[in-house]
Swiss-Prot record:
This is Probable endonuclease 4. Its EC number is 3.1.21.2. Zn(2+) 1 binds at residues 74, 112, 147. Belongs to the AP endonuclease 2 family. One of its GO terms (molecular function) is phosphoric diester hydrolase activity.
Length: 279
């Protein structure tokens, strides 16, 4: 039987010269056992060859502490899989991104569901469905975790049941949910009433699909649709609720990733992880 444990880390930089090795070293120094990276700048499609990732150095020093399945890769923002005009670019790019992930064994790709422009939300979901099927058909192993969104602009994915319905329609074990605490709060879910929220997740059959958690406080009150992350305990969600999520039995063995703001141009993930763990 799998041991129940807390898996926690943060977004860390994946950059020259050390790439994967450097990201793992930063996470290790933060006392983390998970991490999230972008394989390039979130705003563009430029990627370095996987030969530069320093995979062997990562395996030598950190693989037993930050195991590959707890390395989360976030898809870049430029891939809008719900836009028919960007369909080929988005799907082809993500197929290659998943293949890059396979070189070091990362298990989860977090993906924003997308947004609609000159077309309807219903069409956006239809395009997203086709995109996911294409990507899944041409890749192996990696699980795509659709992120819950705040409702900013014309984003889709703000209603958790809509994402769950899409997953159940496609019927692939390689589809999951990434629950972002700031986003669901900003979208109108009162996660401060945590047990009520968890019961709702169970009622809509969503809880079983949550495989990644983004743990962020929010700069705005509930249902603001703003998507502005705040440091742990400094926002409207509050420390108590966020710590409850970390220790909750329903979320054990799920990688919990912090994406909170830097303070005076310095990341404070080490302090926030320590605070959340009560150390």
């Amino acid at each position: 039987m799998k041991e129940n444990k807390i898996i926690i880390g943060s977004h860390v930089e994946f950059k020259a010269p050390d790439y994967l090795f450097g990201a793992a070293k930063t996470s290790y120094n933060n006392k983390a056992n998970a991490m999230m990276i972008y394989l390039g700048a979130p705003q563009n499609s430029k990627r370095v060859n996987v030969s530069k990732y320093k995979i062997e150095e990562y395996k030598r020093d950190f693989e037993k502490i930050i195991v590959p399945e707890n390395i989360i890769v976030h898809a870049p923002y430029i891939t809008n899989c719900a836009n028919p005009d960007k369909f080929d670019f988005a799907t082809d790019f993500l197929i290659e991104e998943i293949r890059r992930m396979s070189f070091f064994g990362a298990k989860y790709l977090v993906l924003h569901p997308g947004a609609f422009t000159t077309f309807s939300k219903e069409i956006a979901y239809e395009i997203l469905e086709k995109a996911l099927i294409k990507i899944l058909d041409q890749t192996e192993n990696v699980v795509i975790a659709l992120e819950t969104m705040s409702g900013k602009g014309t984003e889709i994915g703000t209603k958790i049941n809509e994402l769950t319905n899409l997953i159940e329609k496609i019927k692939s074990p390689r589809l999951a949910l990434c629950l972002d605490t700031c986003h669901v709060w900003d979208a109108g879910y009162d996660i401060k009433n945590l047990e009520v929220f968890i019961n709702h997740l169970e009622e809509i059959d969503a809880l079983k699909y949550i495989k990644v958690i983004h743990l962020n406080d929010s700069k705005n009150d509930i249902f603001s649709k703003k998507d502005r992350h705040e440091n742990i305990g400094k926002g409207f969600i509050g420390f108590e609720t966020l710590q409850k999520i970390v220790f909750h039995e329903k979320f054990k063995n799920i990688p919990i990733i912090l994406e909170t703001p830097w303070v005076e141009n310095i990341p404070i993930y080490d302090k926030e992880i320590k605070l959340l763990l009560g150390q």
